[in-house]
């Protein structure tokens, strides 16, 4: 191999290594921005990790609730990255998301993510800055489930894994949990070159303007 080829090989190797490191950092960041829990559902253990699509999320962004669901490694169930962990496909037929904010609720159909087994998405656009609750419900392993996840105001949480044992419902027990995901934030400080005004704020402005016009008639 001549010197030119050796130089090119070294360059390509360095680039490939950088890409792998960047990908690893992205995976770690995604994991931290979601809340992972280990559940015993029926006779099997599952890791169910829930968060918002495209975090960090701002008001009026295209986002949504997403879940990563895998069968835990029987030999090392408390380790979500164990070699025997298996992503579960086909659950879009048996589960849904219910999103809620204040007294408003809405059911969303779950779709499998493109070419990412075990990853399920339900798209929506958060219209105000508030605390959102994602309820994953339906059946898993022929057992009825209703699992509540709530965003954290002020940003995502990392933290160490906490191993707990608590029955949630018949046939469903939580065994471990870690992390958290942030609530949608205001775009007021992120807008450029002009301050961003949300759709909800625009509607409020229009209503106030109409109210003022009606009062002068």
Task: Show the residue positions of the predicted features.
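C-terminal segment of classical bacterial N-terminal signal peptides
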Residues: 21-30
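Bacterial N-terminal signal peptides that target proteins for export
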Residues: 2-17
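N-terminal soluble domains immediately following signal/targeting peptides that reside
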Residues: 30-216
């Amino acid at each position: 191999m001549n010197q030119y080829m050796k130089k090119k090989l070294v360059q390509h190797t360095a680039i490939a290594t950088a890409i792998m490191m960047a990908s690893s950092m992205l995976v770690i960041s995604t994991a931290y921005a979601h809340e992972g829990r280990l559940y015993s559902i029926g006779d099997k253990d599952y890791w169910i990790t829930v968060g918002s699509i495209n975090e960090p999320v701002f008001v009026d962004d295209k986002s949504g609730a997403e879940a990563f669901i895998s069968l835990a490694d029987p030999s090392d169930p408390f380790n979500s990255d164990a070699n025997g962990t298996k992503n579960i496909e086909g659950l879009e037929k048996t589960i849904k998301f219910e999103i809620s904010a204040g007294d408003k609720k809405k059911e969303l159909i779950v779709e499998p993510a493109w070419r990412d087994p075990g990853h399920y998405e339900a798209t929506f656009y958060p219209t105000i800055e508030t605390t959102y609750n994602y309820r994953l419900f339906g059946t898993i392993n022929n057992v009825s489930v209703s699992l509540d996840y709530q965003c954290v105001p002020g940003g995502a949480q990392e933290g160490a894994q906490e191993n707990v044992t608590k029955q949630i419902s018949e046939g469903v027990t939580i065994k471990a949990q870690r992390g958290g995901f942030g609530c949608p934030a205001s775009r007021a400080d992120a807008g450029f070159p002009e301050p961003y005004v949300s759709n909800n704020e625009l509607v409020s402005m229009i209503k106030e303007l109409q109210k003022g016009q009606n009062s002068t008639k």
